[in-house]
C-alpha cells in the first residue's frame, strides 16, 4: 500500500513523469501494484496535498465524482523538480494556465481545445499556435506563450499570471 516513504516517492515520480495524462485507474493500479480504489484515493490525496490537479469534464451529480479527464502537476515548479530532463514545454504551458485559473474559477475540459472556463474555450500553445483548432468556436481564445501582447482572440500566456 501507501505505507512507507519509498512507495510514496515512487508513486509521485511515476505520476510526475506522466503528466499531463488521461488517467486510466486500472492501468495505474497495475503499474503501481495497488488496488484500483487505492489509486483513486491516492489521486485525491495528491490533489488535496497540492501535488496534482485533476481536470474534469463539465458534468453534474454522481458522474462528476469519478470522471477525471486529465491529470496535471499542481504547478510548473514541480514539473522541473520531479523530472530528470527538461519538461515538455507544451505541458508546462498547460500546467501554468490550469493552475492559475483554477484558483479563481472552475476549469473543465473542452471537446475542441484544451480548456473551458465559464463558457469560454481556450487553446494553449506557443507563439506559432494557429487559430485552426478554435476557428469556428464561439467565445474561443488562443493563449500563446512567447508573445508580448495579444490581439482579438489571442492572449499572452503571461497575462494569466496576474490572476493568481
Question: How would you describe each model-predicted region?
Answer:
Residues 1, 5-6, 10-113:
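Accessory nucleic acid-recognition modules appended to NTPase machines
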Residues 3, 117, 136-138:
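Short, structured coil segments at secondary-structure junctions
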Residues 53-54, 73, 123, 142-144:
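Structural signal for conserved beta-strand scaffold positions within catalytic alpha/beta enzyme cores
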Residues 97, 101, 115-130:
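Conserved catalytic cores of phosphodiester-cleaving nucleases, focusing on short active-site segments
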Residues 105, 110-112, 125-164:
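Catalytic cores of nucleic-acid endonucleases
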